[in-house]
Swiss-Prot record:
Name of the protein this chain belongs to: Ribosome-binding factor A
Gene: rbfA
Molecular function (Gene Ontology), one example: ribosomal small subunit binding
GO biological process: one example: maturation of SSU-rRNA
Similarity annotation: Belongs to the RbfA family.
Length: 119
């Protein structure tokens, strides 16, 4: 069974993705990807996870740009979803991709040492 919070989260994901393509003109927002949206059970808060392709400074600038556009994004969500309460939007950098790359580099390092021992 699919929860309502999951459905609303998916819709918010679509809305924000479309806004990034068409509506947001903030130059601080770099090349970013929305990786997921997690809703609270009462649908009052949406945590939007994103990744940025670039340096740490690009990550900070993109997060600042997203936070400055919070009001506009929330207004657009409210118009699209027509819910009684429009969820508060929080933006968080998704560290799972960085963590995955770190694990992958460790596994490659282990594989390289195993190959060296077998020779």
């Amino acid at each position: 069974m699919v929860k309502r919070s999951d459905k609303v989260g998916e819709e918010i994901h679509k809305i924000i993705s479309e806004l990034l393509i068409k509506g947001l003109k903030d130059p601080r927002i770099g090349f970013l990807t929305i990786t997921g949206v997690k809703m609270t059970p009462d649908l009052r808060q949406a945590t939007v996870y994103f990744t940025v392709h670039g340096s740490d400074e690009d990550k900070k600038n993109s997060e600042a740009g997203l936070n400055s556009a919070k009001g506009y994004i929330r207004k657009e969500i409210g118009q699209a979803l027509k819910m009684r309460f429009v969820p508060e939007v929080l933006f968080k950098y998704d560290t799972s991709l960085d963590y995955g790359q770190h694990i992958e580099s460790i596994l490659k390092e282990i594989g390289a040492t195993d190959d060296g021992e077998q020779s």
